[in-house]
């Protein structure tokens, strides 16, 4: 494939945008080459500025669960834009989507909308600290909760891709209140609680980690974490920015039957527009201003276009819940097909999957935390990435990102992808 127009656009972008991109992973720095500039997308496919078509497994990093330019979402946004794009006032639409979201997730009473997953997680931490009157939090190495200072401590895909697990600009004072645990290691978490008695406000975790590849929680881990938080009067925060409304109607909480105290949402809940949210029971949410002392605000929070897109998306998922079973079947089919051809071509690999999230690791050993995720062969991944790109398959340009499957993908698309993996893996 030729990428002449993308190359020209990247050179122009570099003159006025740091690194030529507005989110670092898009720059292809870890895989080399020139980033592909998108021109349009529809269904399972994205089209670049050179006219190339790709089967898309990024899906805007997760939101496009029903495919690109999903008609009910597009129609809702167009119609809403005709009556105004932003008001800075409450609207009926905000209440409508809030009611629907609360009805879909069994353990939340109220929800506050923000503009991104980063804002959602940042606000959830502030709320937890205010509610518990404690300062420290526990996060897990390799889990990414946005680019807020508190979270940029071994933050997974973005940080490790660029070799800077702790970002300059994060103060030592902020860092000392962020305690780091190993994913899937409950004893490690117990030790942190024991060493910081009555100081820990919350534990925040991706119930399925998605920023060191796709890492499932081991059996009993989330339940033990829930119990440990309860015993220590700390809040459990699930960052469901990736998993919310994707793994099930009620997200990872429903899938694993474990309930958190605060839940963060993003991606799917916005239907492709900038939306984040955090939610909890009344007792906790009533601590937020204007009801309570914990301040949180946003000029564009509850933006009518974003709310229209999110409402259309959630309605589609709520009214067609068989989509989750279809996604499970499609992703299982894809994962097995990829595993079979990699094995037949003698390529060392491990594939992790939960629902419609999957990752390919070029390592023979199980991948269950940040340290094991880093053992993969990055040189092999680079060849794999560029080989698939040349075949018309677009996966994330980082070995530490998850593939997101959309319902727009047909079995013909999946077979096309498996054949591409077969062809590429013969030369790895």
From Swiss-Prot:
Q: Which SUPFAM superfamilies match?
A: PLP-dependent transferases
- Pathway(s): Porphyrin-containing compound metabolism; protoporphyrin-IX biosynthesis; 5-aminolevulinate from L-glutamyl-tRNA(Glu): step 2/2
Q: Describe its assembly.
A: Homodimer.
Gene (name only): hemL
List the GO terms this entry assigns under cellular component, sorted alphabetically. Answer: cytoplasm
> Main site of residence?
cytoplasm
EC no. given is 5.4.3.8
The family database entries (HAMAP family) matched by this protein are listed as:
HemL_aminotrans_3
Concerning InterPro entries, the annotation shows: 4pyrrol_synth_GluAld_NH2Trfase, Aminotrans_3, Aminotrans_3_PPA_site, PyrdxlP-dep_Trfase, PyrdxlP-dep_Trfase_major, PyrdxlP-dep_Trfase_small
User: Which family does the entry's similarity section mention?
Assistant: Belongs to the class-III pyridoxal-phosphate-dependent aminotransferase family. HemL subfamily.
Protein name as catalogued? Glutamate-1-semialdehyde 2,1-aminomutase
Q: Which residues carry this modification: N6-(pyridoxal phosphate)lysine?
A: 267
**Native species of this protein?**
Flavobacterium psychrophilum (strain ATCC 49511 / DSM 21280 / CIP 103535 / JIP02/86)
